[in-house]
């Protein structure tokens, strides 16, 4: 498990070793440059997690007969946003597993029996649709019935206060991430 601090150290000892922001290869990124480098790390992670399915999560959606478009946003979650002013909190998250606004793309949808529903198939009566990346459209919703949505998820955004947090990336992609950060720093 590689932490953000380790990624910064690796950058300072390799791709960024010959520039001022890396303490000239002494094993760290100077404090005033960390926010900029971490911004590039976040951009690189978002690009990789968007192009390759590196994280999947699922969420339960409770249907209401008058709602056809279900926006996968935390303001519609039961626990993620306790102060929500939304009248219908249809995302059924849990207190210890709150929904995060991390949807890249909806991948699969399952009904309450576990059967996979057709996705974006106009030829199927029970098909559900994705008019936007984080919107599930259910043409014929049934109040109280839940569907499970499997989606491609983003990497959590990292900050300068997250140096001990794990960068959730397969080992083989860290070199790609470092190369992307170097490209952004030098361009």
Question: Where in the sequence are the language-model features?
Answer:
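Glycine-enriched, solvent-exposed interface loops adjoining structured elements
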Residues: 1-187
